[in-house]
């Protein structure tokens, strides 16, 4: 009874456990401060920097387009404030998914601690990957990326973005930045933190690089491709936790993972190595956002190639570990067959002894006693 009373007792205010249990409510209050600031004229100018997208430019309508004017956006230092606000939103959404979806499933399935943490990770990431993949695909279709692939490098620099494009990148940066405090909120194990930091850092590095170097068209295509493959992996792992015999999803993911790496390299080399290399304007100009110079192109291709090689190395190690576990699981089943035959033969030998030696009962049987007396 004493243990139950301790568990129901609320922790002290602003203590370590209090922050962990109520971090979503605390973050919600901080986000509400920015939203309430929009209601007052004094604070509206400061709050609007956090809530809405900045640096918009209105372009007049052309003859080819509609009669209405078009609003486009470019990036700037104020985007950091917007990323911070939507990082708070990502923390709130993370807590809602955890409490109202994943925790309920965990109570029904009764997972172990190891499976519990992996299930939560795959549940959160599969929801994010699905949403981002659908959103990114919608942008690709609406802006004719699929019908005209040359848009990846044509008219570079792509310093002006549509509302959907810029909001997509702001949301991506906000989500992966929110993953850092989630390591603390979710009580991540110390041995898992380095792995988490590596892939969070890789996401932020490549997304921010595509955003700042005005390679947002190429970055969007590669993100949608990568997110689709990762969504398939995490949704397969969710099905695997519910039924350990489920392996079809992993087999399909393994094929698509390799194809995804090849497509990433092909699109990157085609866009950066050939498309931008043949462009007329190849001068470094920070005012217009033109980074189409040889050094930048080599750095971009090198970072992409190194990342793809690192992912393939992790993938090969993952597959080897799975094959070892599968072979180790089948090995005891093969070894059990000869033990059954030995057991049958040992039953026949129990009349004379155990393991080739006479027992005391056999040695002292009446027949042996008669032979001894004679």
UniProtKB/Swiss-Prot annotation:
GO terms for cellular component: endoplasmic reticulum; endoplasmic reticulum membrane; membrane. Involved in the translocation of nascent protein chains into or through the endoplasmic reticulum (ER) membrane by facilitating the proper chain positioning at the SEC61 channel. Regulates the exposure of nascent secretory protein chain to the cytosol during translocation into the ER. May affect the phospholipid bilayer in the vicinity of the lateral gate of the SEC61 channel, thereby facilitating ER protein transport. Intimately associates with transmembrane (TM) domain of nascent membrane proteins during the entire integration process into the ER membrane. It is found in: Endoplasmic reticulum membrane. InterPro entries: TLC-dom (IPR006634), Translocation_assoc_membrane (IPR016447). Keywords: Endoplasmic reticulum, Glycoprotein, Host-virus interaction, Membrane, Phosphoprotein, Protein transport, Translocation, Transmembrane, Transmembrane helix, Transport, Unfolded protein response. Residues 352-363 have a biased composition (Polar residues). It comes from the Eukaryota. Pfam families: TRAM_LAG1_CLN8. Residues 334-374 are annotated as: Disordered. Residues 1-29, 98-121, 181-192, 239-251, 319-374 are cytoplasmic. Induction: Up-regulated upon endoplasmic reticulum stress. One of its GO terms (biological process) is cotranslational protein targeting to membrane. The modification Phosphoserine is found at residue 365. The keyword Endoplasmic reticulum applies. This is Translocating chain-associated membrane protein 1. Residues 334-347 have a biased composition (Basic residues). Residues 117-326 form the TLC domain. Interacts with SEC61B. May interact with Derlin-1/DERL1. It is a multi-pass membrane protein. Residues 51-76, 143-159, 214-217, 273-297 are lumenal. The chain crosses the membrane at residues 30-50, 77-97, 122-142, 160-180, 193-213, 218-238, 252-272, 298-318. Glycans are attached at residue 56. One of its GO terms (molecular function) is signaling receptor activity. N-glycosylated. Belongs to the TRAM family.
């Amino acid at each position: 009874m004493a243990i139950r009373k301790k568990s129901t007792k609320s922790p002290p205010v602003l203590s370590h456990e209090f922050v962990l249990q109520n971090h979503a409510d605390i973050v919600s209050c901080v986000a509400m401060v920015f939203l309430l600031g929009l209601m007052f004229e004094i604070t509206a100018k400061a709050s609007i920097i956090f809530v809405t997208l900045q640096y918009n430019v209105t372009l007049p309508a052309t003859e080819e387009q509609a009669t209405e004017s078009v609003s486009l956006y470019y990036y700037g230092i104020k985007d950091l404030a917007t990323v911070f606000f939507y990082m708070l939103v990502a923390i709130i959404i993370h807590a809602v998914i955890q409490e109202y979806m994943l925790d309920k499933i965990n109570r029904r399935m009764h997972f172990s601690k190891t499976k519990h943490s992996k299930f939560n990770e795959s549940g959160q990431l599969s929801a994010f990957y699905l949403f981002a993949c659908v959103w990114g695909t919608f942008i690709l279709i609406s802006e004719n990326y699929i019908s005209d692939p040359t848009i990846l490098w044509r008219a570079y620099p792509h310093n002006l973005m549509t509302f959907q494009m810029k909001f997509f990148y702001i949301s991506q940066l906000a989500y992966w930045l929110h993953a850092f405090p989630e390591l603390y909120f979710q009580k991540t194990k110390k041995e898992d933190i380095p792995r988490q930091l590596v892939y969070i850092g890789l996401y932020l590095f490549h997304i921010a690089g595509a955003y700042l170097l005005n390679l947002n068209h190429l970055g969007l295509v590669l993100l949608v491709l990568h997110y689709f493959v990762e969504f398939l992996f995490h949704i397969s792992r969710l099905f695997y936790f519910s039924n350990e015999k489920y392996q079809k999803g992993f087999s399909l993911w393994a094929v698509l993972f390799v194809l995804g790496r090849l497509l990433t390299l092909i699109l990157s080399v085609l866009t950066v190595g050939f498309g931008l290399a043949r462009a007329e304007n190849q001068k470094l100009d920070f005012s217009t956002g033109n980074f189409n110079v040889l050094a930048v192109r080599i750095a971009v291709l090198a970072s992409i190639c190194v990342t793809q090689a690192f992912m393939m190395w992790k993938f090969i190690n993952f597959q080897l570990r799975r094959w070892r576990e599968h072979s180790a699981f089948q090995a005891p089943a093969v070894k059990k067959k000869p033990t059954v035959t030995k057991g049958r033969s040992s039953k026949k030998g129990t009349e004379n002894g155990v393991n080739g030696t006479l027992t005391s009962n056999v040695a002292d049987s009446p027949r042996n006693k008669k032979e001894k007396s004679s």
